[in-house]
């Protein structure tokens, strides 16, 4: 017999609190999204991506989940995203990025270097020169303490008011930093991840300052 959403939520409460997850904008298959059918909810959204990279990006959900925008953004405006959970693993570093090709390419619009996610809400600005239309909005996190992992949640969003195209946006913004998914790049426990190309919008926390050297350096 199928468990109700409430009962399943109670049974998985400890798992949901084990790590962190983006709760707004609603990620693909999120338990926070009231429009996701019960049978499609991922109650392990807080789990990291597979260490072999087999479900990078977005746990693969962008390829098998019907597209439905959970947020609408206007270029040049400021919005917020929310992270939920209790085990912050000492913080770490996060990035916010956009993809216009269904997850093949992610470009960074904001980095939070150090101390992320020690607060639950972050403001971010949608740049004025982004492209319009459907996009994937992604939150990625490299924890400071614990196993070397990559956490990633993605949301379908729609953007208007931008002056760019997908190609011009991809040319103007840095690539998403990717590590700990079998790609030959790994972070180091206890050492802050400092992105080599964080973009123009950067929030500093923990022990990271604007003069902190990039680490790790991966090619």
Swiss-Prot record:
InterPro entries: Cellulose/chitin-bd_N (IPR004302)
Gene name as annotated: AA11A
Protein's recorded name: AA11 family lytic polysaccharide monooxygenase A
Regions that span the bilayer: none
Signal peptide start-end: 1-18
Cystines in this chain: 58-154, 94-116, 185-218
The organism of origin for this protein: Aspergillus fumigatus (strain CBS 144.89 / FGSC A1163 / CEA10) (Neosartorya fumigata)
One GO process term, biological-process aspect: chitin catabolic process
EC code: 1.14.99.-
Glycan attachment residues as annotated in the record: 80
Keyword presence, ATP-binding: no
Binding locations of Cu(+): 19, 89
PANTHER family linked to this entry: PROTEIN, PUTATIVE (AFU_ORTHOLOGUE AFUA_6G10930)-RELATED (PTHR36182:SF1)
Pfam families named in the record: LPMO_10
Molecular function in Gene Ontology: metal ion binding; monooxygenase activity
Named cofactor requirement(s): Cu(2+)
Family: Belongs to the polysaccharide monooxygenase AA11 family.
Record text on cofactor binding: Binds 1 copper ion per subunit.
Function: Lytic polysaccharide monooxygenase (LPMO) that depolymerizes chitin via the oxidation of scissile beta-(1-4)-glycosidic bonds, yielding C1 or C4 oxidation products. Catalysis by LPMOs requires the reduction of the active-site copper from Cu(II) to Cu(I) by a reducing agent and H(2)O(2) or O(2) as a cosubstrate. Has considerable affinity for alpha-chitin and, more so, beta-chitin. Active toward both alpha-chitin and beta-chitin allomorphs and enhances chitin degradation by an endoacting chitinase, in particular for alpha-chitin, and so plays a role in fungal chitin turnover.
Keywords on record: Carbohydrate metabolism, Chitin degradation, Copper, Disulfide bond, Glycoprotein, Metal-binding, Monooxygenase, Oxidoreductase, Polysaccharide degradation, Signal
């Amino acid at each position: 017999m199928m468990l109700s959403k409430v009962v399943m939520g109670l049974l998985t409460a400890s798992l949901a609190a084990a790590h962190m997850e983006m709760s707004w904008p609603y990620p693909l298959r999120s338990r926070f999204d009231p429009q996701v059918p019960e049978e499609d909810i991922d109650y392990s959204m807080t789990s990291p991506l597979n260490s072999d990279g087999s479900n990078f990006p977005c746990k693969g959900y962008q390829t098998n989940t019907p597209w439905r925008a959970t947020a609408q953004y206007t270029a040049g405006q400021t919005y917020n995203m929310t992270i939920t959970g209790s085990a912050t693993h000492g913080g770490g570093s996060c990035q916010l990025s956009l993809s216009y090709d269904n997850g093949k390419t992610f470009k960074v619009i904001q980095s939070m270097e150090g101390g992320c996610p020690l607060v639950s809400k972050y403001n971010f600005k949608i740049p004025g020169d982004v492209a319009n239309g459907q996009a994937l909005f992604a939150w990625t996190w490299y924890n400071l303490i614990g196993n070397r992992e990559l956490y990633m949640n993605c949301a379908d969003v729609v953007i208007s008011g931008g002056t760019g195209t997908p190609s011009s946006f991809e040319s103007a913004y840095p690539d998403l930093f990717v590590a700990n998914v079998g790609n030959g790049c790994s972070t180091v426990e206890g050492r802050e991840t400092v992105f080599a190309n964080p973009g123009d919008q950067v929030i500093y926390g923990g022990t990271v300052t604007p003069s902190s050297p990039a680490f790790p350096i991966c090619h």
